[in-house]
Amino acid sequence: MRKATLDRNTAETKIHLELHVDGKGKYEISTGIRFFDHMLELFTRHGAFDVTLRCEGDLDVDQHHTVEDVGIALGQAFTQALGSKMGILRAGYFVMPMDETLAVAAVDLSGRSAYAVDTKVKVRIVGDLQTELVDDFFEGFSRGALANVHIKVMYGRSNHHKIEASFKAFARALRFACAKDKRLAKVLPSTKGLL
């Protein structure tokens, strides 16, 4: 069972996270930022991951610590749950339409952190979320998971749809990267010998 339980406590946030990689898209999520919760719910459903997440952050200061730390913790949970990464596909990509918006995501669970995100969001706030923090979430995940994360919105009108399509595409790309390949069950997907 590819599962992880993680508690991450700092002076800025207190996070409890439970992850089941091979889940059914069930979630219980509370970060104190409703639009962010909604995006994380979409992430779990489209990735078919089961996630329980509670975060108490210093939202009276700013949303940054909450959003970034959730990304870091989620990335760390995937690293923990996947263990040696033996037999996984390692990389995945997905092209996600969301009405008039199209987003592309690619993920490589390479053991190296790198990210590039272009959501083309043109407003400061969507719902109750500071939109610049979308990048911080994906960067945090990349750092926590030691993964390459690339997301690009190709086009779209609605800023809500641009963010939503990004989270959905990311979830589905990550789902493929985590998938097992029975032919390579005892093979590490790297010529270096480690990830």
From Swiss-Prot:
InterPro entries: IGPD_sf, ImidazoleglycerolP_deHydtase, ImidazoleglycerP_deHydtase_CS, Ribosomal_Su5_D2-typ_SF. Pathway: Amino-acid biosynthesis; L-histidine biosynthesis; L-histidine from 5-phospho-alpha-D-ribose 1-diphosphate: step 6/9. GO terms for molecular function: imidazoleglycerol-phosphate dehydratase activity. Its EC number is 4.2.1.19. One of its GO terms (cellular component) is cytoplasm. Signal peptide: none annotated. It is an enzyme of class 4 (lyase). GO terms for biological process: L-histidine biosynthetic process. It is found in: Cytoplasm. The keyword GTP-binding does not apply. The keyword Amino-acid biosynthesis applies. Keywords: Amino-acid biosynthesis, Cytoplasm, Histidine biosynthesis, Lyase. It comes from the Bacteria. It catalyses: D-erythro-1-(imidazol-4-yl)glycerol 3-phosphate = 3-(imidazol-4-yl)-2-oxopropyl phosphate + H2O. HAMAP family: HisB. Belongs to the imidazoleglycerol-phosphate dehydratase family. PANTHER family: IMIDAZOLEGLYCEROL-PHOSPHATE DEHYDRATASE (PTHR23133:SF2), IMIDAZOLEGLYCEROL-PHOSPHATE DEHYDRATASE HIS7 (PTHR23133). This is Imidazoleglycerol-phosphate dehydratase. The lineage of its organism: Bacteria, Pseudomonadati, Acidobacteriota, Terriglobia, Terriglobales.
